[in-house]
């Protein structure tokens, strides 16, 4: 016989225990003890940024827990997050809210984000506390690191980009936090020979970069930079940059130095893709005592049938190249663009040479550029055929898996906040959640695989 549900929701009193309705293997239950430990000294860290008088504020731990919930489940808009926490029993339990407790208003997050959260750099501190928890659990080996960057689309229309000289930054509609942050950074920026001024800039988020990386459509974006420990793919550092290769390589230096200073971690080797294989960066890596497992960025290959630089022999003692015919290519020692030395052959040698059609068909003499840090490039090339290099190249994919998980499972493909500060906030929260999941899975997997396991 077909049953019928009795619809009567007029009961006034219920015997209800929120704890009993959260499954033992639920994600929030698994990460809860870790978060409790990580946030144990949160109030102490934020105390200098609160007044000693006035009404009590919303508990900062409640706001941090709500943000963790949001980034765990792809709820990055605070207005919707407040609605979901209000309705979801599991979210209420994790945020330590009873059924009758009021959920904070969404505007509370904006006020704290632009104020005490950024002033105290609390997201960075929470992130590092989670990394230390991973280290205590044995998830960080500290021998091999991998680095990579992924483009996150900025909250800026790609159709409204303008040349920098066309924008009036003093206009009333331009008086925003993102623009103020950009202008402040512009005033304090040092001139750099390697950096070219942007051709297109966003009026609403000028800190983002005009990019078409990864074969995507042209857009404004930020670079999400991850430095991971290879063993369990724990994110040991994270940095926000414009979506430009130059800035991403520079961010890697910052992350490695900061990881060593704050966490006491220094890798024996570093894995990365070809974008990081410039002579300048390889020189820095080797100078830091780290073995670079990075393919060398080599643009010396010529058309088929044309002699390339590899066909010439470099004489280190005499500082010159020797061509296949035994002629010399010398240099004046002038450094071009801050990184290249040009070696030139003599017109008298190249003119009657029988190999000229295969060597320099369009010029009267042959010239060869040599990177200022070619020694570092040569040392790295010598590593590229080793078994260790092949193994690290395969393990390097773990950092790409981090980006894939973030975009597919967490729905993180477009920025919600603007400016570098907004990007840093979002990237730190994303890394916090990913590390929490890794740590929770490592701790709970043995318990979940034990039939008699009982978790309180």
What residue spans do the PLM features occupy?
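Short, flexible loop/hinge motifs at secondary-structure junctions
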Residues: 1-15, 166
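Anion-binding and metal-coordination hotspots
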Residues: 4-5, 74-87, 97-456
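Basic, short loop/linker segments at the boundary and entry of helix-turn-helix/winged-helix-like folds
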Residues: 24-68, 372, 376
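Short, aromatic/basic-rich helix-turn unit that serves as a nucleic-acid recognition element
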Residues: 71
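Short arginine-rich
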Residues: 92-96
């Amino acid at each position: 016989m077909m049953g019928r549900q009795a619809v009567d929701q007029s009961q006034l009193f219920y015997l209800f225990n929120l704890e009993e309705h959260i499954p033992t293997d639920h994600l929030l239950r698994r990460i809860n003890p870790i978060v409790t430990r990580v946030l144990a000294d949160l109030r102490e860290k934020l105390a200098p940024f609160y007044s000693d008088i006035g009404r009590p504020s919303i508990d900062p731990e409640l706001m941090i827990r709500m943000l963790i919930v949001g980034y765990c489940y792809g709820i990055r808009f605070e207005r919707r997050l407040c609605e979901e926490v209000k309705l979801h029993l599991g979210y209420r339990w994790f945020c330590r809210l009873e059924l009758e407790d009021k959920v904070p208003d969404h505007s509370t997050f904006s006020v704290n984000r632009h104020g005490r959260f950024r002033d105290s750099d609390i997201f960075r501190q929470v992130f590092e506390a989670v990394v230390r928890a991973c280290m205590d659990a044995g998830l960080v080996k500290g021998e091999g690191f991998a680095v990579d960057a992924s483009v996150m689309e900025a909250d800026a229309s790609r159709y409204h980009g303008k040349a920098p000289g066309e924008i009036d930054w003093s206009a009333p509609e331009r008086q925003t936090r993102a623009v103020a942050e950009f202008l402040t950074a512009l005033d304090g920026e040092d001139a750099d020979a390697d950096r070219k001024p942007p051709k297109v800039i966003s009026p609403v988020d000028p800190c983002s970069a005009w990019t078409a990386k990864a074969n995507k459509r042209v857009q404004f974006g930020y670079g999400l930079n991850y430095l991971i420990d290879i063993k369990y793919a724990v994110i040991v550092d994270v940095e926000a940059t414009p979506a430009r290769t130059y800035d991403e390589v520079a961010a890697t230096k910052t992350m490695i130095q900061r990881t060593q200073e704050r966490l006491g971690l220094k890798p024996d080797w570093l894995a990365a893709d070809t974008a990081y294989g410039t002579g300048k960066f390889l020189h820095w890596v080797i100078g830091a005592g780290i073995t670079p497992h990075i393919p060398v960025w080599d643009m010396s290959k010529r058309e088929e049938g044309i002699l390339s630089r590899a066909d010439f022999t470099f004489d280190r003692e005499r500082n010159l190249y020797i061509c296949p015919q035994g002629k010399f290519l010398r240099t004046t020692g002038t450094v071009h663009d801050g990184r290249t030395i040009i070696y030139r052959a003599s017109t008298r040698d190249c003119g009657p040479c029988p190999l000229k059609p295969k060597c320099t068909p369009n010029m009267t003499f042959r010239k060869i550029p040599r990177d200022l840090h070619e020694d570092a490039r040569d040392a790295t090339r010598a590593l590229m055929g080793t078994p260790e290099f092949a193994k690290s190249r395969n393990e390097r994919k773990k950092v790409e898996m981090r980006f894939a998980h973030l975009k597919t499972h967490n729905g993180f493909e477009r920025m919600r906040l603007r400016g570098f500060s907004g990007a840093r906030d979002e990237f730190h929260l994303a890394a916090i959640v990913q590390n929490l999941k890794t740590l929770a899975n490592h701790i709970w997997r043995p318990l979940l695989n034990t039939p008699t396991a009982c978790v309180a």
